[in-house]
């Protein structure tokens, strides 16, 4: 159970500051085992976040601060780690969805071992992070970093991989031959339950398991020493419309700048993540990610995007059980484009590389309650130097039972 008070300042020159808001997100996860080794995970969720009015209108923090630069799906660099990506509407049909503290099913996943060191999983509502190790020590939505940008490697988010709304159906495997090697892979579809592909706007993501947007992803995790974790990611995804589905930037929609939203795209994504436990009191962590987006309907337009982060994590900071984090990096942004796709779309006044710095402190009151004050500052937000430096602060309270 998460409660947060947050505020934002900055944004586009003529934009309004977002109001100070109070948000909640409540989850109930039920785990059932039939053999003692398997697990059926059922997750219920309610929240009061809003992603704004999809396609037209406003309502999200990103749309308030960046009315021209934010995604038409309410995505932007100011998003929180614990904020559902498509809050309050269903991107499968652009209709209202779960929100306003309605209780909805956000996770349904079955995991079972089938042989020594080999496990399979399948579910109609799942996320990539259900299967892949996050490696970043402050990835926790309730007790880790506040921003969405620095929580996990962005490759894990491609094609709605971690929407926190139960969007994707997925199946895959986990292979752990020894204590050093962990290999996992999955196939996921964000439109598996839809029988007919009507195209945009009726079914913008497609329909069926194999006719529309999908992602095929793999992660190789290595533990070469007791104090070092390494992760290597690759994902291939097809998107029926011109989006990434990461929820990390306004460029996640209309990714091929200058081309229509209805343009389908193929995305090849690569990433690497590490955590080095220097000593019991300080960890170094970081990631790098690169996305190669290509037009999929006969054209040759392309756009490349990149992101990186370096951070320090402090277990038992000032007292046992408390943690702290300090991060700096580049939020996901365009770094190249051509053959008809523009590097600087019309909505960007003066292209510049964005940077973000963030700090948080998680204070553990008892085994069930913690509070996390923190803030992050974005320079050249949404990749536009005409935008004012944007600050986001939050006080998050987390109850765990």
Where on the chain are the PLM-derived regions?
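Outer membrane beta-barrel
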Residues: 4, 11, 15-193, 220-225, ...
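Outer-membrane beta-barrel proteins
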Residues: 14-18, 30, 94-98, 159-161, ...
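Residues that define the transmembrane beta-barrel architecture of outer-membrane proteins
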Residues: 20-26, 102-106, 165-169, 212-216, ...
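Solvent-exposed loop segments that connect transmembrane elements
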Residues: 54-92, 143-148, 193-209, 240-263, ...
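Surface-exposed extracellular loop regions of Gram-negative outer-membrane beta-barrel proteins
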Residues: 63-70, 74-76, 178-186, 271-291, ...
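Membrane-embedded translocation segments of transport machinery
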Residues: 174-176, 183-277, 281, 292-294
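Outer membrane beta-barrel transmembrane domains
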Residues: 233-264, 271-275, 285-385
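Outer-membrane beta-barrel "beta-signal"
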Residues: 312, 389-401
């Amino acid at each position: 159970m998460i409660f947060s008070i947050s505020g934002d300042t900055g944004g586009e020159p003529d934009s309004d500051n977002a109001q100070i808001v109070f948000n909640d997100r409540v989850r109930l996860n039920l785990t059932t085992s039939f053999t003692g080794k398997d697990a059926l995970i059922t997750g219920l969720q309610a929240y009061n976040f809003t992603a704004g009015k999809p396609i037209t209108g406003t309502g999200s923090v990103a749309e308030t601060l960046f009315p021209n630069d934010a995604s038409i799906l309410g995505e932007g660099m100011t998003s929180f780690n614990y904020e559902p990506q498509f809050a309050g509407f269903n991107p499968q049909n652009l209709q209202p969805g779960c929100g306003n503290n309605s209780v909805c099913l956000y996770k349904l996943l079955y995991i079972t071992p089938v042989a020594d060191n080999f496990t399979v999983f399948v579910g109609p509502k799942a996320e990539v992070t259900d299967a892949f190790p996050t490696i970043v020590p402050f990835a926790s939505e309730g007790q880790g970093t506040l921003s969405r940008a620095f929580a996990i490697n962005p490759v894990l988010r491609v094609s709605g991989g971690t929407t926190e709304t139960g969007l994707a159906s997925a199946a895959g495997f986990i292979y752990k031959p020894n204590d050093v090697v962990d290999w996992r892979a999955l196939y996921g579809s964000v439109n598996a339950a839809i029988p007919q592909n009507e195209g945009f706007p009726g079914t913008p993501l497609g329909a069926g398991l194999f006719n529309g947007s999908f992602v095929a992803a793999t992660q190789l995790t290595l533990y070469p020493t007791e104090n070092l974790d390494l992760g290597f990611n690759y994902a291939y995804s097809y998107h029926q419309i011109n989006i990434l589905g990461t929820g990390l930037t306004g460029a996640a929609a209309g990714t091929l700048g200058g081309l229509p939203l209805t343009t389908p795209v193929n995305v090849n994504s690569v990433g690497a993540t590490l955590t080095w436990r220097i000593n019991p009191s300080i960890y170094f962590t970081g990631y790098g990610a690169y996305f190669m987006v290509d037009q999929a309907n006969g054209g040759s337009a392309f756009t490349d995007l990149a992101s990186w982060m370096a951070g320090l994590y402090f277990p038992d900071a000032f007292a046992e059980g408390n943690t702290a984090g300090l991060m700096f990096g580049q939020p996901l942004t365009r770094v190249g484009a051509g053959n008809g796709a523009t590097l600087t779309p019309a909505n960007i006044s003066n292209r510049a590389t964005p940077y973000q710095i963030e700090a948080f402190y998680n204070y553990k009151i008892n085994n069930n309650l913690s509070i996390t004050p923190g803030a992050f500052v974005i320079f050249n937000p949404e990749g536009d130097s005409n935008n004012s430096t944007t600050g986001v602060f939050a006080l998050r309270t987390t109850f765990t039972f």
